[in-house]
Amino acid sequence: MIKLTPRQAEILGFIKRCLEDNGFPPTRAEIAQELGFKSPNAAEEHLKALARKGAIEMTPGASRGIRIPGFEARPDESSLPVIGRVAAGAPILAQQHIEESCNINPSFFHPSANYLLRVHGMSMKDVGILDGDLLAVHTTREARNGQIVVARIGDEVTVKRFKREGSKVWLLAENPDFAPIEVDLKDQELVIEGLSVGVIRR
């Protein structure tokens, strides 16, 4: 059994509440505000102590890079996690990628969305997907020609229109300034992470 100080137990409880209510952990600043610390640095020291005791795991360099081993978050069914930049090799829905939660019902989209992916760049501007938009994504490994997909090639995640002929796949931009990405599945792995089912502009 992990032995925690009262303060550490209080912080761990707050992290659990955030995971249950929002689906993602708090930032250091949010912990400092909730617990009355003068600065996020004080929260960081307590988090390091919790990590040393094995109560949490921390991802360096990520503002929300906190997870509790064995703890399954139950996010609000009327909200979706917003995914920012995806780290190389990490699952898209890894906690360190979640920036915030957006209050929109997943069933608003068809098929229902599993998460919102923040768009970076203008490669899909001609179909109205712009830099900074939130792309609603339905998680699936299957895609048909012509669908807009979230695809992973090596360590890169990209949003493009899907086209396949035999073992050849083309990921097509909707902007003439961007060349198609061609992948031969015999030589290179390509993973479909999901389908675009909508766009939110803030």
From Swiss-Prot:
Q: Which residues form the active site?
A: 123, 160
What one GO molecular function would you report for this record? Answer: DNA binding
User: Which Pfam families is this protein grouped with?
Assistant: LexA_DNA_bind, Peptidase_S24
Which keywords label this protein? Autocatalytic cleavage, DNA damage, DNA repair, DNA replication, DNA-binding, Hydrolase, Repressor, SOS response, Transcription, Transcription regulation
Q: Where is this site: Cleavage?
A: 88-89
Report the EC number(s), separated by commas if there are several: 3.4.21.88
Catalytically driven reaction(s): Hydrolysis of Ala-|-Gly bond in repressor LexA
Which SUPFAM superfamilies does this chain map to? LexA/Signal peptidase, Winged helix' DNA-binding domain
Is Isomerase there in the keyword field?
no
Superkingdom of this protein's organism? Bacteria
Q: Which residues bind DNA?
A: 28-48
Choose any GO biological process term that the UniProt entry carries and state it: proteolysis
The answer to whether keyword Cell membrane applies is: no
Quaternary context = Homodimer.
Q: What does this protein do?
A: Represses a number of genes involved in the response to DNA damage (SOS response), including recA and lexA. In the presence of single-stranded DNA, RecA interacts with LexA causing an autocatalytic cleavage which disrupts the DNA-binding part of LexA, leading to derepression of the SOS regulon and eventually DNA repair.
| Record-stated family | Belongs to the peptidase S24 family.
Name used for this protein in its record: LexA repressor 1
Recorded source organism is Pseudomonas syringae pv. tomato (strain ATCC BAA-871 / DC3000)
